[in-house]
Structure formats: C-alpha cells, structure tokens
Amino acid sequence: MDQLNAKEQQEFQKLVEQKQMKDFMRLYSGLVERCFTDCVNDFTSSKLTSKEESCILKCSEKFLKHSERVGQRFQEQNAALGQGLGR
C-alpha cells in the first residue's frame, strides 16, 4: 500500500469499503433469510409470536457468533501465513 500514490490509496480504500459493505449486506441477508425461514411459521398475524421472537433472537445470536468465529479463524490463518512467508 506504501507503493501507491495518494489518489491510488484513496481509490483502493474506496474499493475495500465497497467490498466490506457488500460482505456485510450478504451476511445480513443470509441472517434474515435463514432466521425467517427457520423461525416464522404463523402468517395469520402481522406480529411475531413470543415463540417466533425467541427463536429469531437465538438464531441471530448463533449466526453472528458463528460468523465472528469464522472471521477469527481467517485472521489466525492469515497471521500464520504471514509469519510463514517471513513478514
């Protein structure tokens, strides 16, 4: 990144931010789809039942913890790879 001039660094940063937003939206969409499909079963009311609310809360917490854990593993692997390459 040090080899890039200021304009190139700015463009690179913009691309990184766009990718992060895209990844976040993919994560969020996956969370909504999965938890809705697994938890919402009663379409006779526009409100969630207490059972559905509880299920969605547990589902979203589990999904986010899993995603966080996967991210940590990627960081660990990248660090190990970086050390292996002599960085």
Swiss-Prot record:
One of its GO terms (cellular component) is extracellular region. It is a peripheral membrane protein. It comes from the Eukaryota. Disulfide bonds join C35-C59, C39-C55. Keywords: Chaperone, Disulfide bond, Membrane, Metal-binding, Mitochondrion, Mitochondrion inner membrane, Protein transport, Translocation, Transport, Zinc. InterPro entries: Mito_inner_translocase_sub, Tim10-like, Tim10-like_dom_sf. The keyword Mitochondrion applies. One of its GO terms (molecular function) is metal ion binding. It is found in: Mitochondrion inner membrane. GO terms for biological process: protein insertion into mitochondrial inner membrane. A motif (Twin CX3C motif) lies at residues 35-59. SUPFAM superfamilies: Tim10-like. Gene3D superfamilies: Mitochondrial import inner membrane translocase subunit tim13 like domains. Heterohexamer; composed of 3 copies of TIM9 and 3 copies of TIM10, named soluble 70 kDa complex. Associates with the TIM22 complex, whose core is composed of TIM22 and TIM54. Interacts with the transmembrane regions of multi-pass transmembrane proteins in transit. Belongs to the small Tim family. Mitochondrial intermembrane chaperone that participates in the import and insertion of multi-pass transmembrane proteins into the mitochondrial inner membrane. Also required for the transfer of beta-barrel precursors from the TOM complex to the sorting and assembly machinery (SAM complex) of the outer membrane. Acts as a chaperone-like protein that protects the hydrophobic precursors from aggregation and guide them through the mitochondrial intermembrane space. This is Mitochondrial import inner membrane translocase subunit TIM9. It comes from Candida glabrata (strain ATCC 2001 / BCRC 20586 / JCM 3761 / NBRC 0622 / NRRL Y-65 / CBS 138). The gene is TIM9.
